[in-house]
């Protein structure tokens, strides 16, 4: 650490760089070389890497010098200094500082070998280089240069300007090279990659100037790269570009997978649709045959004829000829036309599947979903409707999956970047601490003592001031709210555990701050400290000490003050600065994350008695602030940063107002202005508090000089400003004035005034939304007067607030600044109302809508998220802007001329089209359009005018860089701005705003009136006592309604609230006894009439955060009752107040088959007839009937039958298309079937009523659904019977039968899960939808202001031409023409327009989904004034309105849906499957590994054949190399297939035929060889069967190709599918791990995606039935034609699949919006009685908008959410040390050692097996000792079980851990359950014990041999005696070690066996073995 510390501050740090300094460096370098020991073995290399010093991140070049160094001494600015960083002590470097303290590092070697660091020229160059003016000049030059680049036709003199620019850049580079050196050493010119850019740009400039290179414009485009220089000049941009490059690197795997998948799909497309898109309807030539027969030659050129466009059938209004196909379900030609291949492909010939490259482009377009509806319609028309399946596959796998994988990877890269920033901040904090420690040691003791005294004084002062003034209510939590990232959540879990540990330690130590024992203190804390509070906020710093814990704290003396507000916090909250900071782990060092969530459970309690003697003050906008005192500055991840006057960047909390004048301290609390009579704290006092506190809290160990330095750095402005503010902005002039202020304050601050203002905002918005075209003068007058009134009201509010609060405090609050701004604009608008062109100011009034955010948390959150994203993305936005600029200029330079010269190719009139690149603005628009995802159409134009290659490259680059990477980074940031806390607890910490207070007051008033009325009634009618509780119950029911529907704590009334022995409330229940609630958190619970009931499945157990203290019941019951009465809840609340009736039902056992009661208790009490005695008579029979019905209904067969009926009845609906009238039989069958189904469903419902009773039936949502659907069928059945079937109401009711399939939802588990998840998400989705609507409302009203009435135009219906403005200028001119020619000419309006707010919404939806937006934009850009004829691009800058809307309305708001859904997923996951939340990382690792290995077991390998030849072939075929060769052949086969084209020559066709034949032979050989070697086992493997089928088809296909292709699919298709086999080799390739992860993510997603697919199919089914019944007969135009329509069920499904991705929904909607005269009401349809072809606009709009929202925004986004979720899971899993693959390879290798799959391996084979495994499980040889040390259990026969080996090896990889044992036990049980074979084998020894035995045996043998050797020297008799004695002795010796020295068997044996018996057997066996050894030796 010491190496990283900075040198001590002060003048000593700054040492000029002299020749001596250089000599010292050289000396140190020489010393370090001598010290370096020679490198031994490479094993310690890694340790060396870690221990090596690293450069200090704070002292990197380009960063500001840390403030701890103080000011730069006089004369040392811009002078070379010795390096501050210890890392560079042994490197030749020096640093230079400029005035802004920016650090520049240079190489101390001579620059260009000539200029030493002490050379005058070099020093001058350095001075120039580091001067801020120099970089300013360069920056201005770059920007000016950029402006010049945008000129499409630069003037003559611009050439000279160009030379100037080149000169300046050359000068800059020369200065850099002289100052730094060229390229040899570190920190020289070319060592910085950004300088490469400069160098290349300058070189290109000179090259193009002096060398003639032909196409100069292409080279000139390189100048654009100069714009990139901005990145190197602006500091923050380099890092963001670094992040971008990182994410691009990470994308490599996804890119490979994407290209692979697209290639496969392109191949399939090539085989299926080759040449199809050239099929056109050609007029059959009349004289064709005659001219041919006369002279034996053709009379005309056939080729020319079929390629002549005039012979093709053209659809009116379409540019392309009609396509057709020869299959029955393809498009048909009109009479007289023949379908044949003719002409070129559609879209200039670029849309086709004729070659692999065009097919690939088509697939890429499909993947990015750009104008894919056109490709879809063309292909289906040419090939047939069945090929819709191909598109479904590509859209779901290709588009949704691959594109979102890119998003997932970019999001993950961003997340990692975030994490890195976080860790860096952590590291800096540690370094900072260490630094301060070092400084502390260097201080004189006297100074330290002085500091301590000063700190003491400060604390007393602070507390005294607080006590006197009663100020100190903390900073509002809304300011502290932060959009946290996922990592914060993970850290929170770790913190929970740490906190619990701390608390328990605190209790043991008796720490008074953590645990309060005394009763009096309890009481004090329960009352908390209460503070007068209003909206006047100032910032103020106070001590980091627990004020609550100081006995006699002045705060406590204020608890009786009338103006108090109840506020509470947990006791563990306030810590002394020395204790571990429990919040330091969070994103910013405030209590936001952990504490905010902790309290969210008990939010309602915060709303306390808010009345006070100064009742005007009870209306502060954010009341009941909870007191927060935070620890010293911790790392701040997502703080905003501001730059003060000194250029010092300071980090401030997220919501804090930057404009505040106070010196920004790090521990801030908001002070609220006091009640009357209080002294106002002067500015100077406040500033001094800030200073003292700063000294105390952050720098309590820093020297006095440093404190001053810090002071300066923290000040935002010079002191004179504070003086000015104090004098002029705080008005304290006269007592009368102060009195007036108090009165005004009383009025303005009341919650009811806030409510009134909010109502005014809503009304004002309504008034603005009521504008439309055309309006009557009276209505216009009403709106104008309304506007004046509202402007008056808001102006009055502003002035009154200014009086009440003083300007200084008024402008401290953001909302007030906002109000002031809007009021000023409104007043300005009134004064400038008549000025032409300023009507746009009216639009600013719309911003008032945002004032709703003050009282609407979700809107507030949305604005915060957008603000946060834009703020955090400032740099990224800049990068995006640079990218857009560069590409726009490149486009203009490269293609601008081509557009002008070749315009006739793309426009018949030879006029530039709307989308071109001839000037910068249009070029910018094209690039922006590409960013929006629409690139293909503009690219076609570009390719047509400027050549294919260049356009493809440029457009692809924009698409990939701009759209896929940068935009996804935007989206990733948006998603990371989301967190579960945001939507659940939007209102920060659930505190009340004034609106809620006023609503509560009103409710209390109503409730009080009710109670009084009820009491009055009681007195009159003498009701029974039992009814007395009812008013309260009703009150609480109402209360529950206003509370958000979160599960959590239910509070309900209960008469008997008891305490058990511990003083714990028994109402909490045993299941949650550990969650006993803190007194000061839960004093409201002490009410004897309350119990708390906690559902077990608490989402994220917030109770974990609470301390386990007893709940005391001291507070008075009455008070609590009142407090509960004004309880309300924010959205974030998890409390529901419910009547007592709703107790949790006890789970009944399944066998309990008695039906529930029929009626509710209320019914039975009121109607005695409902009470039935089931013991006797009719009652008994009724009961038996009910039980029988119950048995029937509960039976599985009944449910199956009903499902079958539902499916049949749904299927029947699909037949009711427009042809039903003609198919009489089907119609009759359907009519009868409908009746039968209706009767069956009625019977089912009656049975269920009887069985379940009305209560159970009607309390189930699914039953209600059934009931409503049956009711609809019943009504239509009765209407039919009575003959009313033709009534309009009945007809529309019949369409509701389309909802029948919904009944299937409750029956299919998979769909029900998805629906439940969706239903859970509905509140937040609706919330976001509502917020989006408000957001869009502003744009819609603005659109009405800008475009209302301007979209009309005069049009010739026959020629379909719009008149020019010189012929028709306005509506009057058009009407004159119409008089002359009434039928042809019309004054029309564009169908989608901005004539009113509703129409505006529809237009904006089309713009946001990028469908149909072009026509809307064109109309806007051509618009002039209301009722004037449009002029082509007459209002071109209106494009900007749409650009802004797309960024804010589409980008942010639509992507919020993804955010909300993902968020909901995470919340639900926590609720249900969140057991892993409570696992440590270590445990999780083990758990995952065990989960994987538990699911596998050894399989029996295919036995090797006994026949010798078969055996050889078997070995050959089963080798890995054989597989790889086959894979390579498959890939080669694919390549040859890619070469195929539609127009290939005969010769080419023959070559390909023979190549294909060779491959078929190869694959046939493979098949034959495998069948020969594997025998019948060949067919046990799925892949083999697949190969076999493909081979057979290929062989048959060779001979019968024509027949097969005619009736079936082309057999080549199967060869493409064979590519799937490549998946098998991915496992063998080490480098393919990333791709495996991606595929693994897909596999994991499949089940969930299947469920979502089912739901989507159901939605499509219902909508297509609905579409058939409503839009079957609409006119064929725009998107509806003979194939794509709602006439039949199939066609409807094809259309709905298309608009699932929102593609082309505008085209389908347009014909439905037709009203006469655009359509006819009398048009007859042959074969049907229906008349007319008009649509129904309102039904149509509802139909499409609801479908878009359900499918495109919700279901598709769920798909995205699942992919993102599973990708992160898969990535985590792939990061695990052991993956699924490792276990698979383990078992694969196991098969070779255990061919019979016995699950055992012999001990002698263990070493070979361990060595044969692959990393990480491999134990390389020599491994004997390591294996023995593993102590593996062995069974008889010296065999070891595979699971034991796997456990041991896993343990070796993961490391040992005590937490393993339980998991291991579980796994073993699981394995034994799935593999019963293990049970029979009990271990009798272990490898370690075996080794010990062997060693013992060797020792004994040696000893025994010794005895034998000595035996010859002794007499036989004596020897025999001795031998006898020694034998017994030896026996003892031999038996002892083997039993005594070995550990017991308990660890390896199963508990149910007798240990004794086993030990005995073991002893016998050993004795036997030793005897044998002895005998053999003898």
Curated annotation (Swiss-Prot):
Biological function: Pore-forming subunit of a voltage-gated sodium channel complex assuming opened or closed conformations in response to the voltage difference across membranes and through which sodium ions selectively pass along their electrochemical gradient. Contributes to neuronal excitability by regulating action potential threshold and propagation.
Tissues showing expression: Isoform 1 is highly expressed in brain, moderately in spinal cord, and at low levels in dorsal root ganglia, nodose ganglia and superior cervical ganglia. Not detected in sciatic nerve and non-neuronal tissues. Isoform 2 is hardly detectable, if at all, in brain, expressed at low levels in spinal cord and at highest levels in dorsal root ganglia.
Keywords recorded for this protein, A-Z: Cell membrane, Cell projection, Disulfide bond, Glycoprotein, Ion channel, Ion transport, Membrane, Metal-binding, Phosphoprotein, Repeat, Sodium, Sodium channel, Sodium transport, Transmembrane, Transmembrane helix, Transport, Ubl conjugation, Voltage-gated channel
Species this protein is from: Rattus norvegicus
Gene assigned in the entry: Scn8a
III repeat ranges, renumbered to this chain: 1178-1493
Topology Extracellular: residue spans: 152-158, 212-217, 274-355, 381-387, 771-781, 836-837, 891-919, 941-953, 1216-1228, 1281-1288, 1345-1397, 1420-1436, 1540-1550, 1600-1612, 1667-1688, 1712-1740
Species classification: Eukaryota, Metazoa, Chordata, Craniata, Vertebrata
Protein name per Swiss-Prot or TrEMBL: Sodium channel protein type 8 subunit alpha
IV-type repeats, residues: 1502-1799
Positions of modified residues (Phosphoserine): 518, 520, 1495
């Amino acid at each position: 650490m010491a190496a990283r510390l900075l040198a001590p501050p002060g003048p000593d740090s700054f040492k000029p760089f002299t020749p001596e300094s250089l000599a010292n460096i050289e000396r140190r370098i020489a010393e370090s070389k001598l010290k370096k020991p020679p490198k031994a073995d490479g094993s310690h290399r890694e340790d060396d890497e870690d221990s090596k010093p690293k450069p200090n991140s704070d002292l990197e070049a380009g960063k500001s010098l840390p403030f701890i160094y103080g000011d730069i001494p006089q004369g040392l600015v811009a002078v070379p200094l010795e390096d501050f960083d210890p890392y560079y002590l042994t490197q030749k470097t020096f640093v230079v500082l400029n005035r802004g303290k920016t650090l520049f590092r240079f190489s101390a070697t001579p620059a260009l070998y000539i200029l030493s660091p002490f050379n005058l020229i070099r020093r001058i160059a350095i001075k120039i280089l580091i001067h801020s003016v120099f970089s300013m000049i360069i920056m201005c030059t770059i920007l000016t240069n950029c402006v010049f680049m945008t000129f499409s036709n630069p003037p003559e003199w611009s050439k000279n300007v160009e030379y100037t620019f080149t000169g300046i850049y050359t000068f800059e580079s020369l200065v850099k090279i002289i100052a730094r050196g060229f390229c040899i050493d570190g920190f020289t010119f070319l060592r910085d990659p950004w300088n490469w850019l400069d160098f290349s740009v300058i070189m290109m400039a000179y090259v193009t100037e002096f060398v003639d290179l032909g196409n100069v414009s292409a080279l000139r485009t390189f100048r654009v790269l100069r714009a990139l220089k901005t990145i190197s000049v602006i500091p923050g941009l380099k890092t963001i570009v670094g992040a971008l490059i990182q994410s691009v690197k990470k994308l490599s795997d996804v890119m490979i997978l994407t290209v692979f998948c697209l290639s496969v799909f392109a191949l399939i497309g090539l085989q299926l649709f080759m040449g199809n898109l050239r099929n056109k309807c050609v007029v059959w030539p009349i004289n064709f045959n005659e001219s041919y027969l006369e002279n034996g030659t053709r009379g005309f050129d056939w080729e020319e004829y079929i390629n002549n466009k005039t012979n093709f059938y053209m659809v009116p209004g379409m540019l392309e000829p009609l396509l057709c196909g020869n299959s029955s379900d393809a498009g048909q030609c009109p009479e007289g036309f023949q379908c044949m291949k003719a002409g070129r492909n559609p879209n200039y010939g670029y849309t086709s599947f004729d070659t692999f490259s065009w097919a690939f482009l088509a697939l890429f377009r499909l993947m990015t979903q750009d104008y894919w509806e056109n490709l879809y319609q063309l292909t289906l028309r040419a090939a047939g409707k069945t090929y819709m399946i191909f598109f479904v596959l590509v859209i779901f796998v290709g588009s949704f999956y691959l594109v979102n994988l890119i998003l997932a990877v970019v999001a993950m890269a961003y997340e990692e970047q975030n994490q890195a920033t976080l860790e860096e901040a952590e590291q800096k904090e540690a370094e900072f601490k260490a630094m301060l420690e070092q400084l502390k040691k260097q201080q004189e003791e006297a100074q330290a003592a002085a500091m301590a005294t000063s700190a003491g004084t400060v604390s007393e002062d602070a507390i005294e001031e607080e006590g006197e003034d009663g100020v100190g209510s903390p900073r509002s939590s809304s300011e502290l709210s932060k959009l946290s990232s996922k990592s914060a959540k993970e850290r929170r879990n770790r913190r929970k555990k740490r906190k619990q540990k701390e608390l328990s330690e605190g209790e043991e130590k008796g720490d008074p701050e953590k645990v309060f024992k005394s009763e009096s203190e309890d009481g004090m804390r329960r009352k908390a400290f209460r503070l007068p509070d209003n909206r006047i906020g100032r910032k103020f710093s106070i001590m980091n000490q627990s004020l609550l814990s100081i006995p006699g704290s002045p705060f406590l003396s204020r608890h009786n003050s009338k103006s108090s507000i109840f506020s509470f916090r947990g006791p563990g909250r306030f810590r002394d600065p020395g204790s571990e900071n429990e919040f330091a782990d969070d994103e910013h060092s405030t209590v936001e994350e952990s504490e905010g969530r902790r309290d969210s459970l008990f939010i309602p309690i915060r709303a306390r008695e808010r009345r006070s003697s100064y009742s005007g003050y009870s209306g502060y906008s954010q009341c009941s602030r909870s007191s927060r005192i935070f620890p010293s500055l911790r790392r701040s991840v997502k703080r905003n940063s501001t730059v003060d006057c000194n250029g010092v960047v300071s980090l401030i909390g997220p919501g804090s107002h930057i404009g505040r004048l106070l010196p920004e301290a790090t521990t801030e609390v908001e002070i609220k202005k006091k009640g009357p009579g209080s002294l106002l704290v002067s500015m100077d006092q406040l500033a001094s508090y800030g200073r003292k506190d700063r000294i105390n809290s952050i720098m309590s160990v820093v020297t006095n000089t440093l404190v001053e330095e810090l002071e300066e750095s923290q000040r935002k402005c010079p002191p004179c400003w504070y003086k000015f503010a104090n004098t002029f902005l705080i008005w304290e002039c006269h007592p009368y004035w102060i009195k007036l202020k108090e009165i005004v304050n009383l009025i303005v601050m009341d919650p009811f005034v806030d409510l009134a203002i909010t109502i005014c905002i809503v009304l004002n918005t309504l008034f603005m939304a009521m504008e439309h075209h055309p309006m009557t003068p009276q209505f216009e007058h009403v709106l104008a007067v309304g506007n004046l009134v509202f402007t008056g009201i808001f102006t009055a509010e502003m002035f009154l607030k200014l009086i009440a609060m003083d300007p200084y405090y008024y402008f401290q609050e953001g909302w007030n600044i906002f109000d002031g701004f809007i009021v000023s604009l409104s007043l300005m608008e009134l004064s400038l109302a008549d000025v032409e062109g300023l009507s746009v100011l009216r639009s600013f009034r719309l911003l008032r809508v945002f004032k709703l955010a003050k009282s609407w948390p979700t809107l507030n959150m949305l604005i915060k998220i957008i603000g946060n994203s834009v703020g955090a993305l400032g740099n990224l936005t800049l990068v995006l802007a640079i990218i857009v600029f560069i590409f726009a200029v490149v486009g203009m330079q490269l293609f601008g001329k081509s557009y002008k010269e070749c315009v006739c190719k793309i426009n018949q009139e030879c006029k530039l089209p709307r989308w071109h690149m001839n000037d910068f603005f249009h070029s910018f628009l094209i690039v922006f359009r590409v960013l929006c995802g629409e690139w293909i159409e503009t690219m076609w134009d570009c390719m047509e005018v400027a050549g294919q290659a260049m356009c493809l490259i440029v457009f692809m680059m924009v698409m990939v860089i701009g759209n896929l990477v940068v935009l996804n980074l935007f989206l990733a940031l948006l998603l990371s701005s989301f967190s579960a806390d945001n939507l659940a607890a939007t209102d920060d910490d659930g505190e009340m705003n004034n609106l809620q207070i006023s609503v509560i007051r009103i409710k209390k008033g109503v409730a009080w009136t009710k109670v009084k009325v009820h009491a009055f009634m009681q007195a009159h009618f003498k009701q029974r006592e039992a009814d007395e509780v009812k008013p309260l119950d009703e009150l609480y029911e109402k209360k529950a309604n206003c509370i958000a529907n979160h599960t959590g704590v239910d509070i309900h009334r209960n008469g008997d609230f008891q305490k058990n022995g511990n003083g714990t409330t028994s109402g909490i229940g045993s299941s949650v006894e550990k969650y006993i609630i803190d007194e000061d958190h839960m004093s409201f619970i002490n009410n004897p009439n309350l119990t708390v009931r906690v559902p077990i499945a608490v989402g994220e157990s917030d109770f974990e955060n609470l301390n386990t203290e007893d709940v005391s019941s001291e507070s008075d019951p009455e008070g609590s009752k009142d407090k509960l009465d004004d309880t309300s809840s924010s959205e974030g609340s998890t409390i529901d107040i419910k009547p007592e009736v709703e107790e949790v039902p006890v789970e009944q056992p399944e066998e309990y088959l008695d039906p529930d009661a029929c009626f509710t208790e209320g019914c039975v009490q009121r109607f005695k007839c409902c009470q039935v005695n089931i013991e006797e008579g009719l009652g008994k029979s009724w009961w038996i009937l009910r039980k029988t019905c119950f048995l029937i209904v509960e039976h599985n067969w009944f449910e199956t039958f009903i499902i079958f009926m539902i499916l049949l009845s749904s299927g029947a609906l699909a037949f009711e298309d427009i042809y039903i009238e003609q198919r009489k039989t089907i119609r009759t069958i359907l009519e009868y079937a409908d009746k039968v189904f209706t009767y069956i469903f009625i019977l089912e419902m009656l049975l269920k009523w009887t069985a379940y009773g009305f209560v159970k039936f009607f309390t189930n949502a699914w039953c209600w659904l059934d009931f409503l659907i049956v009711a609809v069928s019943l009504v239509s059945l009765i209407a039919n019977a009575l003959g009313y079937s033709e009534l309009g109401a009945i007809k529309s009711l019949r369409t509701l039968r389309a909802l029948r399939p919904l009944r299937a939802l409750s029956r299919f588990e998979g769909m029900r899960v998805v629906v439940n998840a969706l239903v859970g998400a509905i509140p937040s989705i609706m919330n976001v939808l509502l917020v989006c609507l408000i957001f869009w409302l502003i744009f819609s009203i603005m659109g009405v202001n800008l475009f209302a009435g301007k979209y009309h135009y005069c049009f010739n219906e026959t020629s379909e031409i719009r008149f020019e403005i010189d012929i028709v200028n306005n509506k009057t001119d058009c009407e004159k023409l119409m008089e002359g020619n009434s039928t042809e000419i019309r004054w029309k309006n564009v169908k989608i327009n901005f004539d009113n707010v509703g129409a505006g919404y529809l237009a904006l939806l089309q713009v946001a989904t990028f469908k149909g937006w072009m026509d809307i934009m064109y109309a806007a850009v051509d618009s002039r004034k209301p009722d004037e004829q449009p002029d082509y691009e007459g209002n071109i800058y209106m494009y900007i309105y749409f650009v802004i809307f797309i960024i804010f309305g589409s980008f942010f708001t639509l992507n919020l849906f993804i955010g909300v859904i993902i968020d909901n997923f995470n919340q639900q996951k926590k609720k249900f499957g969140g057991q892993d939340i409570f696992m440590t990382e270590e445990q999780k690792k083990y758990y995952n590994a065990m989960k994987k290995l538990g699911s596998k077991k050894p399989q029996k390998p295919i036995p090797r054949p006994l026949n010798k030849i078969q055996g050889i072939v078997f070995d050959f075929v089963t080798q890995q190399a054989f597989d790889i060769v086959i894979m390579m052949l498959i890939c080669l086969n694919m390549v040859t297939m890619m070469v195929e084209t539609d127009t290939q020559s005969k010769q080419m066709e023959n070559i390909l035929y023979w190549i294909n034949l060779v491959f078929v032979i190869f694959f046939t050989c493979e098949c034959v060889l495998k069948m020969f070697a594997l025998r019948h086992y060949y067919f046990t493997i799925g892949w083999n069967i697949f190969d076999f089928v493909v081979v057979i088809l290929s062989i048959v296909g060779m001979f019968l190709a024509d027949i097969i292709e005619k009736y079936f699919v082309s057999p080549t298709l199967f060869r493409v599918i064979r590519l799937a086999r490549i998946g098998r080799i991915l496992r063998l390739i080490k480098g393919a791990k990333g791709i495996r992860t991606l595929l693994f993510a897909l596999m994991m997603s499949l089940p969930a995606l299947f469920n979502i697919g089912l739901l989507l199919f159901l939605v499509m089914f219902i909508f297509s039935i609905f579409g058939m019944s409503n839009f079957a007969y609409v006119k064929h135009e725009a998107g509806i034609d003979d194939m794509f329509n709602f006439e039949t069920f199939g066609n409807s499904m094809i259309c709905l699949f298309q608009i699932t991705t929102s593609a082309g929904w505008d085209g389908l909607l347009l014909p439905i919006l037709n009203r006469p005269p655009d359509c006819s009401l009398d048009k007859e349809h042959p074969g049907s009685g229906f008349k007319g072809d008009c649509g129904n606009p309102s039904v149509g709009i509802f139909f499409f908008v609801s479908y878009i929202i359900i499918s495109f925004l919700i279901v598709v986004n769920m798909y995205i959410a699942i992919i993102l979720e599973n990708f992160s899971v898969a990535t985590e899993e792939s990061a695990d040390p052991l993956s699924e693959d490792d276990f698979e390879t383990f078992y694969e290798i196991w098969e070779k050692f255990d061919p019979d799959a016995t699950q055992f391996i012999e001990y002698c084979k263990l070493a070979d097996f361990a060595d044969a495994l692959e990393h990480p499980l491999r134990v390389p040889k020599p491994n004997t000792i390591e294996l023995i040390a593993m102590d593996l259990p062995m069974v008889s026969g010296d065999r070891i079980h595979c699971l034991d080996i796997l456990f041991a090896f896993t343990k070796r990889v993961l490391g040992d851990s005590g937490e393993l044992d339980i998991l291991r036990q579980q796994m073993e049980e699981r394995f034994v359950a799935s593999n019963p074979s293990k049970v029979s084998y009990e271990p009798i020894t272990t490898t370690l014990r075996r080794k010990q035995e062997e060693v013992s045996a060797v020792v004994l043998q040696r000893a025994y041999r010794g005895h034998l050797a000595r035996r010859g020297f002794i007499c036989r008799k004596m020897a025999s005696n001795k031998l006898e004695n020694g034998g017994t002795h030896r026996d003892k010796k031999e038996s002892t070690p083997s039993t005594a020295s070995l550990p017991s068997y308990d660890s390896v044996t199963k508990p149910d066996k007798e240990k004794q018996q086993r030990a005995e057997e073991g002893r016998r066996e050993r004795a036997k073995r030793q005897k044998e050894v002895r005998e053999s030796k003898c």
